[in-house]
Amino acid sequence: MTENFDKVTKKVEAMYMKYPYPSPSTESIQTNELLNLLKIFELENGIKLENVKFLDAGTGSGHRITNVAQHYSKCEFLGLDISEKSLEIANVLKNTKKLENIKFRKANLMNNISSLGKFNIVLCMGVLHHLANPAKGLGNLLGTLKKDGIIFLYLYGKLGGHKRMLNKKLISILLAKEKSNYGNGIKLIRELGLNKFEYGWNLNFKSNEEEDSLIVDYLLHANETLYDFNDIDKLFKKSDLYGYTIFGITTGTQGFLFDSSYDIRKKISIPQTNISKFLKSDFSLSYYKSLSLKDKCRVLDIIYEPNGYTIIGFTRQAYEKLSNERLKKNFVKIK
């Protein structure tokens, strides 16, 4: 099995060496999804992220994490990636922004990385689903968590990713034996008008080269696994975490904070999932109210059809410190 993992990892590495993601540009671009996520986490928990050690596992070309490091100047960051080309770009961005609180290094997440030390927060955003064995990769990442640490994951959604995967399959069939010919794949995608991006890929780009990287990651990726709620639950059950909660979901080009409640009284300016918009009568809501938390999550999964999930995994000590009522209400205990 190890040999197969190596083949997959090598394919992914070769792809990102040629098409760094999210951008081959060494210019700073507006990729603030990760920064906004952490700001919301601070706001809901009533905390300030200071003196925190972050591990960004699968940092790519560093555009997102350097924006984060610039904002959280009192925190330390280590960014890991399999692609040396991506890390070269990340280091240029680091130097351009004169950041002293972030370092980058090459690493394979399929290997034991515990020698890197312990971190308060591990970020693995849009990366785990590209590994040959996501469960093993998650285990390796958890080996770097402090006893009161948390991990943020972003995983592709199976239900909302259905059309994208059909388009990906179409291109794969057309390419036939040329599946690794990214240049021809990009040309086909443009000619068929399939370069219309969903959340995470719908970034501003200034050149065909920059769009090429988005196209490859979107429809030509060498390896990816998609998840629904049941798959997420199975993944976390195999881990050593105390439990997890779905922080948010994406559908199309829109993001929602995730909440299984049927009576959301706290009004915030950020869109949230809201079952009462779909189950409008007391009769239908009565059935929903009687469900377990997991079944409520399954119902929301089917209704919203996410193309992505942001999930937070908690150690026991981290959960005991948690003050965010929304996350507590939606917490799925494993142990």
Regions found by a protein language model. Give the residues of each.
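Conserved SAM-binding loop of SAM-dependent methyltransferases across substrates and taxa
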Residues: 61-73
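A short glycine-rich, Lys/Arg-flanked "PGG" loop and its adjoining helix->strand segment in the class I
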Residues: 136-147
